[in-house]
Amino acid sequence: MSEQDYAVAWTAAGRRTLARLPEKVATAVVEFLYRSLAASPLRVGKPLKLGLEGLHSARRGDYRVIYRIDDHRRRVDVVAIEHRSDIYRSRQP
C-alpha cells in the first residue's frame, strides 16, 4: 500500500456480507479491495444512481462490491459484497 492509496474501512453490514461469502470468493475480494480498489477507487468502480447516489459498485467475478468514497479522509468504506443477482434488490428505493 503506497501513501497515495486509500484506506479500506468496513461497515458492519460490509463485514457481515464478507463473512457469508465462500472462502475462495472472500479471499479474492479482499485481495481486490486492498490492492486495486485502494489504489484507484474511482477507476475500478462506477457511481450508482436511482436512490443509491454516493455509492459506487465494482465487479469481482460474479460478485459486486458496494462502497462509499471519502476523498477528504482518503478512505473507502465497504458497504456490502454480494452476488450480482442479489446486490441491488434490497437497496432499491
Where are these predicted regions, by residue range?
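Solvent-exposed, flexible loop/coil residues
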Residues: A12, L52, H56-R59, R91-Q92
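A short, surface-exposed loop/turn module that caps and links secondary-structure elements
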Residues: Y34-A58
